[in-house]
Amino acid sequence: MMKYFITAMMCMFFGSAYVLAGDAEETQMLETKKCVACDLNNAWFESAALRKADFSGANLYRANLEYADLRGANFTGANLSNARLRGANLTGAIFDGATLKYTNFGEANLSNASFVDAKMRGARFHNTNTDGIRS
């Protein structure tokens, strides 16, 4: 637990996004913006710059992606159940076939995003920009 606290504090000091769990797949995502079918359960990508990232097939259960730049990101077939995407920029993101049960999209920008065949039971969209969404 102390390792995670120190990592979080260092990254807050330097003003960058940080990952609390600190495993190899999360580091890979931050470095390459590609982590197909990765297990990112409980990952912490708050305020991360992940434009056009490929999360296809990834497990992002309970992940924190609040205020992240995810424009054009690919979440095809990903599990984002109980994930937090509040305030995230998801313009043009692809959620086709994704599981989004109880996902929080509050205050996010979802303009021109695609949700074809997405499972969205209980998802929250309070004050969310949904202009041009495809489903």
Q: Which residues are covered by each model-predicted region?
A:
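Positively charged n-region of N-terminal signal peptides that target proteins for export
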Residues: 1-5
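Tandem repeat scaffolds
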Residues: 21-135
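Cleavable N-terminal signal peptides
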Residues: 7-8, 19
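N-terminal signal peptide c-region/cleavage motif recognized by signal peptidases
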Residues: 14-16
